[in-house]
Each structure stands twice: as structure tokens, then as C-alpha cells.
């Protein structure tokens, strides 16, 4: 290809609350630029308390409309697109009929709590205790990291495992069709790949696939063995024929069928949101760490070519897997991940409660006072994840006094988000033994200077924010461009990524803020196990 060749990559990003499509223009080995965008809201459905769903038909319509609108915004025709890259939220799934394409139920999202009692029952079950004891015994003799991971296994609501088990038990038509082997399961990426290649014929036969980064976080995929975990499928009665073929991120995903957008478009990459943001922040080296602060916060540590076990609540994942070159060299990368499910959701709640009129105001409000006047906030709408691990924790302010102003409460709220992420950072240090030199942040909440500076002070290392904070779409585009030969090496991606701001730790504030964090941890202790207290339960 000539250096002047122009390429246009459409990147579809299906998140928890929004669907976005970006059109990027670039020349071979050149710097990309976003020339067209389109957005749509994901319409979440709440059919029962704790249930969170997405209507597949509405999602499908929105996906096609968003791609069309973004292409129009870029003043391009569909046949000018070089390829399509896809990034999706993880662990939201549906099941559909192989012969008719008809879904059996809405997408059950990763935030859904319908299987909460199953999760609690299994985590307290004799069976799981036996499995953990057996894994611990085997680890003692083999020193295998796989068995070490098994010795501390804990089921979680965001994983697919028990929500899928719930569906298999409670959907009559699905249970009936399971007998004939015509039921297919898939997360959003798998379902979209199926529909996009199928075209307008819902019964058209296509390969049932899912990329490895979307499979690895489901709870029944083994990142050590790179396969569906047979023990989990057996334990939770999940038939393997339901499941998609697991493929690399450089797989030949085929084309968008011409009946959908008027022309065939090459699908050059499919990748999960967190792995895509890893690429968007260019965390390609062992020891690199990035924190995505969106609806929730996700800390990912690049552990290189080794899959590490966790004993403090983080979990190992496959970050990406590529095959390239004539000799099919495999480039596989592992992550250690920790999550806090409430970050952007806390900001949105504060906005709705009238603490500020625009989230952009919150940083200046927090900095307008020297401290929080002793007020602390615990951000636990969805409980508290690692290293605290308490699904029944409550949220709330503590330490409010007659002198407390709105600015103090906003500062306490923002500080709590930084404290929560700093805990994940400390946990990652213990798990990996790495020495981090910087943290790359992305996601909407990373635009908040107060949170970024507080995080730098607490961790004692530089926090780096890229010029593009929506790095999920950028990362999927990078991966597609590499797969298509627009770029030849990951180093070229590092070279074209731009840094918008670096937050260096203020050592004069570090001691004070670490002390505040210790006080915040005492407040967290007050809110632990809140929703299992009998007098609290009786308030409902």
C-alpha cells in the first residue's frame, strides 16, 4: 500500500448505556482522525426489581441506524468503508433458535441480579467448599496457578454462569428446544456477529463464534487452558453445544451481509470493551496498568504472557490473542482485573439529586473547599468488590454536621471514587508484585481532574490521561487496523496515541490524603453487611 492510501474504519461500540459509532480516517502507518460520529441510547428494561434487560430487536435497529448515521456524518458512502471494528460490553447475553433466529428472551445484562440468591447459595454450598478444598490440595502438590485460582473461586452476579443457569431452569420454550440441540447462547458480540453475517434472512446458516476476550470473563471459561471449563459446564448443567466457537481477535470474521447496509463490509475485529480500552491506552507491555472509569471502574494490569492466579479478589483474563504472519505466530496477552461497579452511576445519582447541574462542575466544587469537613461517602450501590468483597454493603454519607455544605459532600463523593480505585491499585500490587510507574486512565469519569489528581496522590505515581478518553472505540479501531495491515506493529499505535494531561503526585498532599483514606476505610466498615441486618431488612 502507498503511504497516501486513505482508509476509513467504522468502529461500533455497544456499551451499557450507549451505542456509538465512530468513523476514523487514516493513511497507511498514519495518524487516525475521527471524521464522523453517531450515538444512540441503550434502552434498559427493568421488568422486576434487580432485573436489567435489553430488547434485542431494539438493539439491532439501533446498531444499524448508528452505523448509517456515523457514515453519513463522515460524508462517506458505505462502500468507502475499509472495515468494521466491534467492541461490546461483556457478560450480557441472550439465547436464540439456530433454525429460526428467534430469541428466547431479552439480553440479560451484566448488572442483572435475578440470580443473586443462586450466587449466594452456591458460594455458601458444600459443593463449592469441596471444590475449593480439592483445588487447594492439588495446588499444594503441583504449585499450579490454575489450582491456586480454583482454591479461592467465588461466583459473582456480573458473571454469566448463574444467570444462564437461571434461564435454563426457568424458560419453558428454551428448555423444550434444548432437547433438539437448536438453542444457541451468546453474549452481545456473538449475537451481533451472527446477525451481521446472516443478513436479512434470520434463518441463514452462519458460524456461531465469539471472540476470546468476551468469553474469558463469563465465569465458565478457563483462561489457563484457553477453553470452556468442563468442570463448570458439568456443575451448572450447561451443554457445550449451546456455546459458540471461541476465536482469536485476528480471526477471519467475514463480512457484514450486503442486504443490511447495501454493500459487503469486512469485519476486521471483535473485542470486549475492557480489552479494547487496553488497546486504546496502548498498555501493551508487561506491568502496564490502565483504569477505565465509566459506569463502573475496571483496573487492568498487563501480566504479559503469563496467566496469574489471584488470592485477593482480582481475576485473571485473556487480554487479547492474535495470530499473524505466514508462520501464524501467536501473540497472547493476559490481564489481572479488578472492578468497582459504581463510579459513573454515583456521579449520575449526584446529578439527579441536585448536587450539581453538570458533572463537569463537580471538580471545581470539590476544589473550592480545602477538605470535606470530615464528611465521608461510601459508594456501594452494587455492594463493594475487591478487596472488600461484600455484596451486602450499603451506601451513604457519614460525618455530616451543621457546618457541612454541598461542596463538602461533593468532595467526599469524588474522594470516595478515588479511594475505591486506589484500593484496587493496592490490591493489584499485592497480586502481581509489579512496580507500576504510571496509571493510564480513560472513560467519562477520567475527565474529572480532581479524581485524577487525588488518585495520583494516593498511589504516588503519575496518572496519564489520553487525548481521547473514549479509548474503547479507539482500541477496537487500532486492532482492526493492525489486522488489516494499515499498521504493521503495536509500536506504531503507541506512536500515534496522544497524551492530553499527566497528573504528578503532590507529595505534600499524599500523607494527608492517605490518612483520609484510612478514615474512609473505617467508614466502609460501618456500612459492611448492611443489608443482611434484620432491622434493616424489615424497613423494606
Where are these regions (language model features)?
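N-terminal glycine/serine-rich phosphate-binding loop of ATP-dependent small-molecule kinases
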Residues: 1-106, 117, 245, 261-269, ...
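Active-site core segments that coordinate phosphate-bearing ligands/cofactors
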Residues: 2-12, 23, 120-134, 141-142, ...
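Short secondary-structure junction motifs
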Residues: 18, 78-81, 241, 372, ...
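Flexible loop residues that form catalytic
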Residues: 89, 251, 444
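Carbohydrate-associated surface elements
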Residues: 112
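Glycine-rich phosphate/pyrophosphate-binding loops
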Residues: 242-244, 488
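Gly/charged, well-structured mid-domain segments that form the phosphate/adenylate-handling core
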Residues: 245-252
Amino acid at each position: 500500500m502507498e503511504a497516501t492510501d486513505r482508509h476509513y474504519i467504522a468502529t461500533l461500540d455497544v456499551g451499557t448505556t450507549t451505542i456509538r459509532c465512530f468513523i476514523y480516517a487514516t493513511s497507511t502507518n498514519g495518524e487516525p482522525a475521527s471524521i464522523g460520529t453517531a450515538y444512540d441510547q441503550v434502552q434498559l428494561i427493568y421488568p422486576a426489581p434487580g432485573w436489567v434487560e435489553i430488547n434485542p430487536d431494539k438493539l439491532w435497529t439501533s446498531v444499524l441506524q448508528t452505523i448509517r448515521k456515523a457514515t453519513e456524518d463522515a460524508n462517506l458512502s458505505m462502500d468507502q468503508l475499509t472495515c468494521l471494528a466491534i467492541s461490546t460490553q461483556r457478560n450480557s447475553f441472550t439465547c436464540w433458535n439456530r433454525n429460526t433466529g428467534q430469541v428466547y428472551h431479552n439480553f440479560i445484562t451484566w448488572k442483572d441480579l435475578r440470580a443473586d440468591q443462586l450466587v449466594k447459595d452456591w458460594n455458601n454450598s458444600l459443593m463449592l467448599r469441596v471444590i475449593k478444598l480439592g483445588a487447594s490440595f492439588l495446588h499444594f502438590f503441583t504449585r499450579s496457578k490454575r489450582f491456586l485460582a480454583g482454591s479461592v473461586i467465588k461466583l459473582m452476579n456480573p458473571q454469566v454462569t448463574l444467570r444462564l443457569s437461571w434461564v435454563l431452569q426457568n424458560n419453558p420454550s428454551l428448555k423444550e428446544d434444548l432437547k433438539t440441540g437448536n438453542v444457541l447462547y451468546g453474549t452481545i458480540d456473538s449475537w451481533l456477529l451472527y446477525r451481521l453475517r446472516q443478513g436479512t434472512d434470520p434463518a441463514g446458516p452462519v458460524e456461531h463464534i465469539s471472540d476470546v476476550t468476551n468469553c474469558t470473563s463469563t465465569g465458565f471459561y478457563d483462561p489457563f487452558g484457553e477453553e470452556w471449563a468442563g468442570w463448570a459446564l458439568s456443575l451448572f448443567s450447561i451443554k457445550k453445544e449451546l456455546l459458540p466457537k471461541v476465536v482469536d481477535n485476528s480471526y477471519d470474521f467475514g463480512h457484514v451481509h450486503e442486504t443490511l447496509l447495501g454493500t459487503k463490509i469486512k469485519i476486521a475485529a471483535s473485542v470486549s470493551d475492557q480489552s479494547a480500552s487496553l488497546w486504546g491506552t496502548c498498555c501493551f507491555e508487561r506491568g502496564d496498568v490502565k483504569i477505565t472509569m465509566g459506569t463502573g471502574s475496571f483496573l487492568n494490569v498487563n501480566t504479559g504472557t503469563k496467566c496469574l492466579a489471584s488470592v485477593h479478589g482480582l481475576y485473571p483474563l485473556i487480554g487479547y490473542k492474535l495470530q499473524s504472519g505466514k508462520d501464524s505466530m501467536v501473540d497472547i496477552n493476559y490481564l489481572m482485573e479488578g472492578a468497582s461497579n459504581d463510579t459513573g452511576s454515583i456521579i449520575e445519582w449526584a446529578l439527579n439529586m441536585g448536587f450539581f447541574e453538570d458533572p463537569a462542575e463537580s471538580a471545581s466544587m470539590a476544589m473550592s473547599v480545602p477538605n470535606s469537613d470530615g464528611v465521608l461517602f461510601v459508594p456501594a450501590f452494587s455492594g463493594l468488590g475487591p478487596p472488600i468483597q461484600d455484596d451486602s454493603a450499603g451506601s451513604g454519607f457519614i460525618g455530616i454536621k451543621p457546618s457541612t455544605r454541598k461542596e463538602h459532600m461533593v468532595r467526599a463523593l469524588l474522594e470516595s471514587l478515588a479511594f475505591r480505585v486506589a484500593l484496587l491499585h493496592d490490591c493489584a500490587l499485592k497480586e502481581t508484585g509489579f512496580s507500576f510507574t504510571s496509571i493510564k486512565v480513560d472513560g467519562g469519569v477520567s475527565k474529572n481532574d480532581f479524581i485524577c489528581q487525588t488518585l495520583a496522590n494516593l498511589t504516588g505515581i503519575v496518572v496519564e490521561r489520553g487525548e481521547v478518553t473514549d479509548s474503547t472505540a479507539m482500541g477496537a479501531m487500532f486492532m482492526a487496523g493492525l489486522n488489516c495491515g494499515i499498521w504493521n506493529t503495536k509500536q506504531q499505535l503507541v506512536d500515534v496515541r496522544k497524551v492530553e494531561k499527566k497528573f504528578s503526585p503532590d507529595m505534600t498532599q499524599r500523607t494527608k490524603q492517605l490518612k483520609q483514606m484510612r478514615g474512609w476505610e473505617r467508614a466502609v466498615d460501618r456500612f459492611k453487611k448492611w443489608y443482611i441486618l434484620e432491622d434493616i431488612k424489615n424497613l423494606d
